[in-house]
């Protein structure tokens, strides 16, 4: 009975399974029938005028449930389609758009698959022809290709070609600077093909201040870089990526410092940073440098006063205009760009090994005192112990570079972009990620990018725009930061770590000094120290474009930019290092008695409002454009600092775990703000497309100045002459596409070196006075007020020539400029008797920059391969012309050692190095003959540097600071 019951259950399960399968098959059949019926009966209307295949597909998908699948390389996106299908079957529309494109389609359910028509054997024939331009001149090197194949040729010196093609095929004829033309092969065998000039080649639009202009109509010095030129570079920041792409623009990179940019030399005694503008909003170098290059559409560099005066007091040292990518009408496009790589330093210090060090040390001692013999420092036995490595605890061979640096480190960057939209709504979204490691171990940086742009055409005359940009950069350091000087100074004869696991305490078989032990680079690196640094940059924009009249556009934009910096650093407790040679004892002074943590936080916000109106009018041979606008800026900044010591253990990562009393607990804060209000305007006038005139004006009022000096006015004027458009150049138009001469002059202001409260009187609360038996804290004047403080001024003259030859194959620019900066802020030394610790800055110094710039670009297409080669060179002569009778100003280099110095001196360049000139090394013969100079009260030995005096000295007299001279300059004379 049990077996029968099991059989019945099994039979029941089989029946159930069969019923389920049958039901599924029925449902599938119904779905297929439904899909087929949908494909056969669904009607839509499609209207496309001078559109593309993609425009038709987009309309079908919007009006139906169909989804298209195809390979983009099989679709000719350039072919123009004119279609007006009303209430047509989808299949009828598909027949129409595929019949002349060598395409076929297949409907599967609600999926439409477009494929290339299989090529069958066809009858071929030979055709010949000539390709000319609109003036009948032959075009040399034009491409003639049979559509859909790799079969093609190029025209000869007379513009002629011959080609064997299939009957009823289509020829694609193209040449740079001309519109591509499709020619259908008919029964004839001779073809005369005339190409029309591509107006876009000369109508290239360049982003300028508060707008765009045709490149050929520019009268100022403007250079532009497209995303294609930088997006594939391996550098992880934008500033490094543009190095070498623009003449006169120099990228300055120093270890431990942010990368900076310099236009046409150093213009003053402080910072010469340009203004950064991203999608119309003012930004800074940090924001710009950390943008994702794959989200950038173009970068314009405004280098002269004519192009940058409209930004007034912020544009004294140029303007960098960034335009990010925007959405376009059409189906969503997804693009990805990624790079994973390894990097290595081009040069690392080649340190001598321990036995070489010992031999050189012996040689130096012998040169100092030959009578003491040749092994004054190390015996031959000790040198052999270094060499054979049999006693590494006593006679090591330590290579500090190998211990702390990696030969290769990883770097990677990824970008993912989405764009698309409809005629009413367009969007672009870009995501970016960068991971980069340093050559010193356990140092890494991560960067995250978001760029979102949305535009909506509410009506034909009103468009709203919005964008969000967000950047986060995290830099983590796991372990301490060894002194780079120690890596080079601590000799290879010092043990990094003993075999017992303790830190090195032996140098050349002897107990090392506390200085060596405390400066052990490996120990400094391997501690429980750590630091975490985070920078968050965000920008939010809302704007509109209103067109109340045909030629009038009113634009408004509001921007809020936020910057937040957070840094937390911990210094761990370190015990004194135990002695390896004297167990049970320690080497004093090699540890620290307490641990500590410090937190720094800084946030600033920048709010801007801009409103402007632009009116354009073209009538007959006249073209006029007028721009007028206002802007308002408000900057606010807050900082906080807190530190504590005496943490219970290294595992604590929060400040609250530290001590809360006395000197073990500190904090501080600051706040500041400024405001600016501005008027600006521009007039462009063009006569007969050959005579160009432009005038810019800006008036800025800044809270950084006293009321009487608050306003600054900055005009510029420029003119251009398109020589190529003159009638007498007609015979040269087959060679010269564009030849333009331009000249400009303008004045700009600089506010970057002015503090928010520099014109105020400053007080400090340091020091005490005694009144009878009572001590009272004193508040005293530390810096007098300076109500006359005003703008630094820049006057810039530029003469330039632009040319495009052979239909854009060769193009270039040449410029000569003179930039005079006056009223540069300079603080005089104040006598100590005044009791003033800080002198107020005054507008007194002057600097001049002069130079040439030249850039050349070659573009060409060979077959299906397009390429571009460019080169540029720029010279710059920088000179301090006036320090207002002030003495030379000498400053230490940023390393703080006070050895190498900068000097500011009239007639010399900013950034001049002030040091001792040397003439090789002293020989023993010179020392014996007394032909030497002392330095620091010390008589030199053979092998010491031979300093050259800059005044009359007798042998044996002392070299002093009076013998320093200019030995170089950090500002290059030319770049290329």
Question: Model regions: which residues?
Answer:
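Conserved small-residue
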Residues: 335-392, 641, 861-974
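Short, small/polar-rich motifs associated with maturation and membrane association
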Residues: 1-451, 458, 463-465, 512, ...
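Outer-membrane beta-barrel biogenesis signature
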Residues: 497-510, 732
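Switch/connector loops and helix/strand junctions flanking conserved nucleotide-binding motifs
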Residues: 215-216, 310-312, 330-331, 345-347, ...
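Well-ordered, non-transmembrane segments within structured domains
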Residues: 36-38, 130-134, 145, 155, ...
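Extracellular/periplasmic, surface-exposed regions of secreted and cell-surface proteins
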Residues: 230, 266, 273, 447, ...
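Acidic, Ser/Thr-rich peripheral helices and adjacent loops at domain boundaries
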Residues: 486-487
């Amino acid at each position: 009975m049990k077996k029968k019951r099991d059989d019945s259950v099994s039979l029941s399960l089989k029946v159930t399974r069969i019923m389920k399968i049958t039901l599924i098959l029925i449902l599938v059949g119904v779905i297929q029938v439904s899909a087929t019926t949908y494909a056969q009966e669904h009607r839509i209307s499609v209207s496309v005028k001078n559109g593309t295949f993609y425009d038709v597909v987009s309309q079908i998908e919007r009006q139906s449930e169909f989804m298209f699948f195809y390979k983009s390389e099989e679709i000719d996106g350039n072919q123009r389609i004119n279609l007006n299908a009303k209430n047509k079957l989808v299949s009828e529309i598909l027949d129409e758009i595929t019949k002349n494109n060598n395409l076929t389609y297949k409907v599967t359910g609600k999926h439409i698959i477009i494929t290339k028509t299989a090529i069958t054997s066809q009858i071929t024939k030979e055709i010949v022809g000539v390709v000319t331009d609109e003036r009948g001149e032959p075009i040399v090197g034009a491409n003639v290709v049979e559509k859909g194949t790799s079969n093609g040729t190029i025209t000869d010196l007379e513009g002629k070609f011959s080609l064997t093609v299939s009957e009823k095929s289509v020829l694609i004829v193209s040449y740079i600077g001309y519109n591509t033309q499709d020619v259908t092969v008919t029964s004839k065998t001779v073809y005369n093909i005339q190409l029309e000039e591509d107006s876009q080649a000369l109508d290239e639009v360049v982003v300028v201040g508060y707008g765009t202009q045709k490149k050929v109509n520019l009268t100022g010095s403007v250079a532009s870089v497209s995303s294609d030129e930088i997006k594939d570079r391996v550098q992880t920041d934008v500033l490094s990526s543009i190095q070498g792409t623009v003449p006169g623009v120099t990228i300055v990179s120093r270890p431990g410092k942010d990368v900076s940019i310099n236009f046409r030399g150093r213009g003053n005694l402080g910072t010469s940073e340009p203004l950064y503008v991203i999608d119309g909003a003012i930004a800074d170098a940090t924001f710009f440098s950390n943008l994702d290059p794959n989200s950038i559409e173009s970068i314009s560099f405004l280098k002269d006063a004519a192009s940058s005066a409209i930004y007034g007091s912020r544009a004294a040292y140029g303007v960098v205009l960034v335009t990010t990518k925007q959405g376009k009408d059409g189906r969503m496009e997804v693009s990805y760009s990624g790079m994973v790589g390894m990097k290595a330093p081009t040069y690392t210090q080649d340190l001598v090994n321990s036995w070489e060090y010992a031999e050189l040390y012996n040689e130096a001692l012998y040169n100092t005192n030959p009578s003491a013999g040749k092994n004054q420092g190390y015996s031959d036995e000790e040198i052999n112990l270094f060499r054979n490595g049999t006693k590494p605890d006593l006679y090591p061979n330590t290579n500090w570079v190998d211990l702390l640096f990696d030969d290769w480190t990883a770097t990677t960057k990824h970008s993912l972009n989405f764009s698309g939209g409809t005629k009413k709504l367009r969007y672009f979204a870009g995501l970016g990620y960068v991971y980069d490691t340093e050559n010193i171990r356990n140092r890494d940086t991560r960067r995250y990018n978001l760029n979102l742009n949305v535009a909506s055409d509410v009506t034909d005359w009103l468009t709203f725009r919005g964008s969000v940009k967000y950047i986060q950069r995290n830099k983590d350091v796991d372990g301490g930061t060894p002194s780079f000087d120690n890596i080079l100074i601590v000799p290879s004869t010092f043990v990094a770590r003993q075999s017992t696991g303790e830190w090195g305490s032996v140098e050349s078989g002897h107990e090392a000094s506390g200085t060596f032990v405390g400066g052990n680079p490996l120990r400094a690196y391997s501690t429980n120290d750590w630091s975490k640094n985070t920078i968050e940059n965000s920008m939010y924009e809302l704007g509109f474009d209103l067109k109340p009249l045909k030629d009038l556009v009113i634009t408004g934009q509001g921007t809020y930019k936020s910057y937040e910096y957070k840094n937390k650093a911990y210094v761990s407790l370190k015990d004194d290092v135990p002695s390896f040679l004297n167990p049970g004892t320690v080497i004093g002074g090699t540890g620290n008695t307490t641990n500590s943590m410090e937190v720094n936080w800084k946030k600033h916000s920048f709010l801007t409002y801009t409103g402007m109106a632009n009116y354009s009018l073209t009538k007959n041979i006249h073209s006029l454009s007028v721009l007028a606008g206002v802007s308002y800026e408000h900057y606010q900044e807050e900082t906080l600092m807190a530190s504590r010591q005496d943490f219970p253990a290294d595992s604590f990562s929060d400040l609250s775990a530290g001590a809360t009393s006395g000197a073990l607990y500190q904090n501080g804060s600051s706040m500041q703000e400024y405001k600016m209000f501005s008027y600006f305007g521009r007039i462009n006038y063009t006569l007969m497309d050959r005579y160009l005139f432009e005038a810019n004006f800006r008036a800025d009022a800044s809270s950084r100045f006293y009321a009487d000096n608050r306003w600054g006015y900055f005009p510029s004027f420029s003119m251009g002459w398109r020589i190529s458009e003159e009638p007498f150049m007609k015979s040269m138009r087959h060679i010269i596409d564009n030849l333009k001469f331009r000249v400009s002059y303008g004045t700009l202001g600089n506010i970057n070196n002015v503090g928010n409260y520099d014109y105020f009187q400053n007080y400090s609360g340091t020091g005490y006075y005694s009144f009878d038996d009572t001590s009272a804290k004193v508040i005293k004047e530390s810096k007098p007020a300076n109500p006359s403080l005003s703008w630094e001024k820049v006057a810039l003259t530029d003469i330039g020539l632009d040319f495009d030859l052979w239909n854009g194959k060769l193009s270039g620019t040449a410029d000569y400029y003179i930039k005079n900066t006056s009223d540069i802020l300079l603080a005089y030394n104040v006598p100590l008797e005044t009791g003033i610790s800080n002198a107020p800055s005054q507008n007194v110094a002057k600097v001049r920059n002069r130079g040439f710039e030249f850039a050349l670009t070659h573009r060409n297409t060979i077959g299906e391969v397009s390429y571009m080669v460019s080169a540029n060179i720029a010279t710059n002569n920088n000179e301090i012309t006036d320090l207002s009778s002030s003495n030379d100003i000498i400053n230490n280099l940023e390393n703080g050692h006070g050895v190498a110095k900068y000097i500011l001196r009239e007639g010399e360049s900013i950034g001049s190095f002030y040091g001792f000139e040397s003439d090789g090394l002293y020989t023993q013969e010179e020392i014996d003959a007394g032909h030497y100079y002392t330095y620091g009260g010390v008589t030199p030995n053979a092998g010491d540097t031979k300093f050259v005096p800059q005044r009359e000295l007798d042998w044996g007299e002392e070299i002093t600071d009076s013998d320093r001279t200019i030995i170089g300059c950090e500002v290059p004379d030319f770049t290329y």
